[in-house]
């Protein structure tokens, strides 16, 4: 608000003014100029007048007499405001705007009173003089405010005290000197109300636009606040879900620990019982040990446990038995083999169904049981059959030099150095040779970043994982790898996979690479031209599989060996645990059901006495389900 100077006051008296002057455009533009022009588009309230005028706006009081404006007494204020509102409505006729309030009596909560079409506020002392505000509302939302002071009152305004109007506001803008610019001259009521009516009419359109923008802004802020509250509620719900999943994870880990503890107890008990069985087998229940069975002239007093042998073979790729015999596993021409060398030099060998860990473990068990029972003659290998494999000679390129370079002797098994160069401690011991990185067009160029390490004997899965090595298969093993994939993940969908290879070759390559890396995590997938050869081998294997399905061969003869009911249930349990390892689900109910089925599988393995040899598979399935729960938790928080 502008400062008021009583030297510029004037007298407004009732009288006849035939042509009262209207507000000019220049006068209106002057009011809309300056930093406080926004006050013209903000309606006023008694509370805001009291806050700004009574407390924040200074008034210059002078020693001269205050000139009379609209004057009345507190007792006659009702009639005075009625007359003023009536005159204002006459000037507003035809503008579509009307003045005055139809309220009467006290206004709730504000302490004001509605009289004569105006709302009268409470009197306050300003610089020692009592001041009384009044607001006349307009129908378009604007307000006209009039400020009265009482020159006769001391501390409080009584009914007989004189009230003098000395300041006018349109909305929040002080328009006193626009409404009554004739300093020192008398003005009629018609002149004042004409000026106020003109200002209200000129300002109405801008006021309505400003109020519309203000309402839109307020609605937007309200909506944003509601959205913020909704998102906070959603975050709170997600936090509760995270806490619930964490609790489920803790319960699962506790159950896994309980199963592991129980497995340890069973392992110790099995060790004790196995020792008793071995002792009884050696002595026949007598203190004097009878001669053990002979194979090739050497005693076969074996005290080894099959689970222990499988574990050592998995970790080291070889194992030494208690009677001095040795077992090892290796891959030749893409086929998996288990070899047992007796202390007398006899060699026994069995071929695994595939190079996958489960099939290799089955072959280990079959050969060991036959050897322990003395029925191993069918696996005897003639000397010429188990000679060391001939290493394919590397054809040296003709460099034009008169003296040929020495031929490098390399091992039969090649492993890509992915993460670090060959150095002591960086690769497993026993390597035959280190080859440089192949040319860029080589199928394994991307894998062998630091060259290729070769070995005469295959490395175990654990060694390849610990040293970040990848077995580089040769082209002659592609058919075997493709056949293994066909019997594995592609078995149920051979026909559809073959159609995909024909209709969408690119998608088939992606699917083949994904399943290859999942089935053979420690074997490199060939790139470049090698990819096309691998794809062709896979197509050939799928075509053969589809042909076998179309024209099935006669069922093979049933083996003589009968499987007990407990072993049959254990086999089903092992198959289910393998399927759990491939499970990819975001359904909490499905995962909970899987957890219950895993517990039933554990019980089946324990009943058949095969829990220990499949303990790693059980733990892997439990960890996989726990990882699925954690993935669901992370996905929920990101959302």
From Swiss-Prot:
It is found in: Virion. Transmembrane segments: none annotated. Keywords: Capsid protein, Coiled coil, Host-virus interaction, Inhibition of host innate immune response by virus, Late protein, Restriction-modification system evasion by virus, Viral capsid assembly, Viral immunoevasion, Viral release from host cell, Virion. Residues 201-284 form a coiled coil. One of its GO terms (biological process) is symbiont-mediated suppression of host innate immune response. Residues 382-407 are annotated as: Disordered. Induction: Expressed late in the viral replication cycle. One of its GO terms (cellular component) is viral capsid. Proteolytically cleaved into a 60 kDa form which is incorporated into the virion. Pfam families: DarA_C, DarA_N. Internal capsid protein that is probably ejected along with the viral DNA and prevents degradation of viral DNA by the host type I restriction-modification antiviral defense system. Plays a role in directing proper capsid assembly. Phage P1 Dar antirestriction system is composed of Hdf, DarA, DdrA, DdrB, DarB and Ulx. Hdf and DarA are incorporated first in the procapsid in a co-dependent manner, followed by DarB, DdrB and Ulx. This is Defense against restriction protein A. The gene is darA.
